[in-house]
Every structure is written in C-alpha cells, then in structure tokens.
A protein has these predicted regions:
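Glycine-rich phosphate-binding loops that contact phosphosugars or nucleotide phosphates
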Residues: 56-213
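Glycine/serine-rich anion-binding loops at beta->alpha junctions
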Residues: 42-58
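A short, well-structured juxtamembrane/interface segment
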Residues: 21-39
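Structured helix-beta-strand junction loops
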Residues: 39-40, 177
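Hydrophobic alpha-helical transmembrane segments of small proteolipidic membrane proteins, enriched
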Residues: 14-17, 27, 42-43, 157, ...
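Generic N-terminal amphipathic, Lys/Arg-enriched alpha-helix
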Residues: 1-20
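Residue-level recognition of alpha-helical structural elements
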Residues: 22-26, 51, 157
C-alpha cells in the first residue's frame, strides 16, 4: 500500500483513538477492497435503516471521485471519442469509477420478493444473483444480528466473496460468517453509527488514494 494511502488510516485513529482496537481489521478491509478492484471485482453492500443509508453513502463515494481526481485513461478517452460529439462529451466529463452495488435500489424486485417469498431472504437472493468469486461483500448492522444481512453474507460467502462485517462492539452473529470483522467499540445504536461513518470514509479515501492518487 502507498504511504499516502496508509496515512488515511493513520489519520482515522488519530482523530478517533477509540478505533485503535479495530484498526487492523479496518486496514484488512481496505487491502481486500484494493485487491478486489484491481482484479476486476466489485463491492456489494447492504444494511437496514441507517445502515442502508450508510450502504448508499459508500456507493456514492466510490462510484465517482471522492477526494481524488479520477480522469479517464488515454485508452478510455480514445474509445469514447470514437462516438462523435457525444463520445467527446463523455470522454471529457466521465470519471473512473469503482464498481459498487448497494442492495437497496431494486424496488420492483424487493417488493415482489417480500410479497411472494420470505422477506428475510431478500438481500440474500439479490446477493446470490450478483456476487462472483473475488468480490467483496460488506454487511452493515449496528447489532450484528440483522437476520437478512447475515443471510446475505452467507449467500455471498457461498459464491466466493470475501465477507466483511461493520458492527458494534459485540459483532453479533454477522461476525460469525465474516472473514473480516470491524466491531467498533460502542454498544448504543447511534454511537455505533457515529463511528461507522468515519470508518468507511477512511477506507474509501485509502482505496481511492491507492488506486488514483499520485
């Protein structure tokens, strides 16, 4: 990992010293994401309530530039420019993305599934459809005991993904099916959420710096 990328994680624990207890797991998550993206994989993420909002937030940071400039490569620009005026517009305006899927956007699927099948399996079905070997699955649950998130993690693990959990102090049952367990040292929901945001911001900054930074 580049020193500048590692510095993002060091800055996290400097600002939030309580996170030192899980700093190794946070770094492991960043390393796995870098490996995943470099090998053509994707991040699949889900949660409930505020954790669903966090999942969407993570996707928003990675699908476009977060803090780094992400200009297209010369080859990408050339390929787009072959499509005339619209291609030139795309070549000038698009940014290099990182592929992330939040399992919260398919309203027609999720409502149909919840109406016709077991609602606890809605994320698992979606993950099973999308996850491939080498991907990373991130399950976010403050308690670690969200059944639908745990089942999705299990489905993703069966597909060959590296599974990561972002939880509160106990880790819950989600931690049992996770290859990497980030258990922030709080037990109240809102306090857990207050630590989840800086964790995933730091990971996104680290990954972006590694892949796009100078």
């Amino acid at each position: 990992m580049k020193p500048s990328a590692k510095n993002e994680l060091t800055a996290l624990t400097a600002r939030y010293p309580s996170l030192c207890v899980c700093s190794g797991d946070i770094e492991s998550f960043a390393v796995e994401l870098i490996r995943c993206f470099e090998s053509g994989g994707k991040l699949v993420v889900c949660g409930n309530g505020g954790s669903a909002a966090d999942a969407l937030h993570i996707a928003g940071e990675l699908l476009k530039g977060f803090r780094e400039k992400r200009p297209l490569t010369a080859a990408e620009s050339s390929a787009l420019s072959a499509f005339g005026e619209d291609g030139m517009t795309l070549a000038a305006g698009l940014q290099r993305p990182l592929p992330v899927v939040s399992l919260h956007g398919e309203t027609a699927f999720s409502t149909a599934w919840n109406n016709d099948a077991d609602p606890a399996l809605v994320y698992a079905q979606h993950a099973y459809a999308l996850v491939r070997r080498g991907d990373v699955f991130l399950g976010i649950s403050t308690s670690g005991n969200a059944v639908n998130v745990r089942l999705a993690a299990t489905a993703a693990k069966a597909r060959g993904a590296v599974t990561v959990s972002l939880t509160g102090q106990s880790g819950g049952r989600l931690a049992e099916v996770s290859d990497i367990r980030i258990c922030v040292p709080e037990s109240e929901t809102y306090k857990i959420q207050e630590l989840h945001l800086p964790v995933y911001h730091a990971v996104c900054l680290c990954v972006e710096k590694e892949l796009f930074g100078q």
